[in-house]
Structure formats: C-alpha cells, structure tokens
C-alpha cells in the first residue's frame, strides 16, 4: 500500500490525522479518537520509505540531520496535508494532518456574527487560541476567506507550513512558508511592514520578537491575525505579557490594550450524532477590557466576559450551554470542558 492510498482511506473516513509508527499498523484519528487500520504493522524501513517518497531532497537532509521535520504537500483532487516526520524508540514515524481543499465559510462553521464585525475593522490584533487540534487554522482560514471575498486589500500570511491555500479573489494574497520562502516568523514580519499589507496572518506567535513585531504591525494600521496555544482569554493575555522582561511589561500592557481587538479561545467538541463542533470563549476589547489589561487586572476578565454578551462576548460555559440546549453537544461532553461543572450536572 502506498502513501496516497493510505491518505485516500484516511480522507474517505473523515479522519483528521493519519499516524504511521514503526512496529505498529497505521492509525487514524476520527472525531477525536485514534483507531487502528486493519492492515499489518509497518517496520522502520516501510515507514521511512512511505515518508521519503513525498519528501524533497532538502526535507530528507533536514530529517536526517535534525531527526524531525515539518512540511506540507498536496494530493490534487484529494486534500493538502501538514506532515511532521520524527524518530521514536522503534524507528521512524509520521503524522499527516488533513487540510481540506475546500475552505469552509464562517457560516458553514457556525461562527457568531461578531467574527465578521471583528474582521471588518481596519486595524488591530485578533488572536485565535486553543490547544493543538482545536481547529484554529480552520477558523483563521474562514476569516481570511471572508476578507478575500469582501474587501480590496493585500493579505500576507506567514505560516509553518502553509496549510489552507487561498486563491486571490477581491484581495491580493501572498502566502509565505517558513524555511522555504523566509528564514523565520521574525524575519518575515520585519519585511512585512515594507510589503504594503492590509492584513497579516502570523501562523504562530512563538517568541518575544514575533509578538513584539505583531503588536507593532497592529499598532501601525494593519489587521493582524495570530494564534497561541492558550486555553482562555485571560491565559492568553498572561502568556503575552510573561514573555517580556520585567522592565518592558508595563509598556507591553499599554500596547496590547490599545491594539487588541479580540481573543477567541476555542475547543473542539464531539457533536451528538457524530462529527465535531467548535465552542468559543470570545473576549472583545471593550474599554473595560482594555482598562483591565492596562492595569494588570487579568483575574477580573472572566466576569467582564460573562456580563458582556451585548458586545458579542461569551464564556466557554455560556457557549456550551447553548450547544447543549440545541442538542448539538451532550451534557457529559460539556462537563469535561466546563469551568463551572454544576451547570452541566
């Protein structure tokens, strides 16, 4: 069985990921659960051959030197895949994340209308956060797609690797892949300010300089989209501030309070009847929220989000209560994610 057949099987079964691991049969993740494929275990040489088959010479060299490598590739007519190849105690291994070739719209994802209002603002910072596999890339792709279909501007993306590929519609789109088109997020963001963008998507706010440059870009008239692996709005603010040395924290709080537009923290939950659905905590940067950021009163944010529904805000619990009422998510499923467990007993 070649890699294309395995990936076609994976896509046909609506798997989010295909896992190859020496010494074990291939496995797929469907609706959050890992399941074995009914074929014999693969040894080290078989896994390596399957993965090497789709790598460029440079990717093979990087894999041999660094023992792991990230890249993306496409099977035309099937899907794109984000790949991480690595070594483990039994030999080679790889994970293929499926990136659908069709970009879902904000409506198809069931996103609240505040998402559209946020991305129609001329400048600022919009953060989409959540654990790995929570659908951040899918949400951001829908936002970029909305801009692309409705605005006349220049969208610049910096990704590692490129996931969803956007065709220019009303907007000019340039997508840059780290290690292929640029040496890193920081270098690409420095250049971005001289490339006349209106919208900048930063695949991941990984380090101090990338965060600093994203804040600067948001302050200087660009709408910047970024992701972090944080699970709530309050933790996101803390994470950004904590990256900076003590002497700069006050200045960064001030910059963030001015440039932030919203933090959307999402969790991907099992849907009643199969499939998955995103639940969102949404914090909009109202004057009250800006004040809390500036004055380092992050602990008070949750209650502001709870009472801010008129401005489009909601806690994860409020969102899940709505999903439970609609019959889209079970109480038991929501209970595992809830801050106030009593709501779902």
Where are the model-predicted features located?
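Short, flexible helix-loop junctions that flank or precede catalytic/ligand sites
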Residues: 1-345
């Amino acid at each position: 069985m070649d890699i294309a057949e395995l990936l076609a099987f994976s896509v046909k079964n609506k798997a989010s990921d295909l896992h190859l691991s020496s010494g074990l049969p291939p496995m797929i993740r469907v609706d959050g659960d890992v399941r074995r494929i009914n074929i014999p275990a693969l040894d080290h040489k078989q896994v390596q051959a399957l993965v090497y088959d789709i790598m460029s010479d440079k990717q093979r060299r990087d894999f041999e030197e660094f023992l792991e490598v990230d890249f993306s590739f496409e099977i035309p007519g099937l899907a794109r895949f984000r790949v991480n190849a690595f070594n483990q105690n039994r030999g080679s291994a790889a994970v293929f994340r499926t990136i659908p070739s069709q970009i879902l719209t904000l409506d198809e994802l069931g996103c609240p209308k505040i998402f559209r209002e946020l991305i129609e603002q001329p400048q600022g910072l919009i953060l989409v956060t959540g654990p790995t596999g929570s659908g951040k890339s899918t949400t951001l792709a829908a936002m970029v797609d909305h801009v692309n279909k409705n605005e006349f501007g220049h969208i610049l993306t910096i990704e590692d690797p490129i996931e969803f590929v956007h065709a220019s519609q009303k907007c000019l789109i340039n997508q840059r892949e780290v290690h292929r088109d640029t040496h890193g997020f920081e270098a690409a963001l420095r250049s971005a300010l001289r490339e006349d963008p209106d919208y900048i998507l930063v695949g991941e706010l990984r380090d101090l300089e990338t965060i600093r440059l994203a804040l600067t870009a948001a302050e200087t008239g660009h709408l910047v989209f970024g992701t972090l692996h944080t699970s709530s709005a309050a933790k996101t603010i803390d994470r950004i501030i904590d990256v900076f040395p003590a002497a700069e924290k006050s200045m960064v709080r001030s910059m963030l309070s001015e440039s932030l537009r919203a933090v959307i923290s999402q969790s991907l939950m099992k849907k009643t009847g199969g499939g998955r659905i995103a639940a969102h905590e949404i914090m909009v940067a109202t004057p009250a929220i800006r004040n809390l950021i500036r004055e380092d009163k992050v602990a008070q944010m949750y209650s502001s989000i709870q009472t801010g529904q008129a401005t489009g805000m909601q806690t994860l619990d409020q969102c899940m209560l709505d999903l439970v009422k609609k019959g889209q998510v079970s109480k038991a499923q929501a209970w595992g994610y809830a801050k106030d467990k009593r709501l779902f007993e």
